[in-house]
Amino acid sequence: HVAEACDAVAREQGWSPQDIDLAWLCGLLHDMGRFEQLRRWDTFKDAESMSHAALGVEVLFGETPADAPAATSIRDFIDDPVEDELIRASIAYHSDFRLPAQLDERTRRFCDIVRDGDKIDIMRTIADSTVDTILKVNEDAFLASHFSAPTLAAFAEHRCVARDERDEPADYL
């Protein structure tokens, strides 16, 4: 779904055919680290393992672990290495709270599109799921919850709520 969202947004923004294809590829590969994360730690939670984004970069651009069931490389997906750094950045930073300030404009555009595609997919997943599945609380507990002070402060400051600031089920809206 993320690859499709990246493709659609890139087309809507009038990107070149080559950049549309590259946006699609970045969206496809953004969660490549999830497979290795599940294999090594039996979890999809970064807090209980390591950043799945960093792990994705390791899987695609690094050495294949000796105990890995198969070798995967960025060359399996694209022959020309000219866009490797842009692809690496779009994968590495897609789950970061903020993008690094020093990114060039083109790399930032690709990072933004992958992050936005990922958010669209997360919202689709949430819309198709129950409160209990997503937040591990029943609907009554969710409806009885309120926004915490840190969440209200983040809203007033026009910024995202950090994970460690979320205390109440409502904070996850």
List each model region and its residues.
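Short coil/turn segments at secondary-structure boundaries
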Residues: 41-51, 75-79
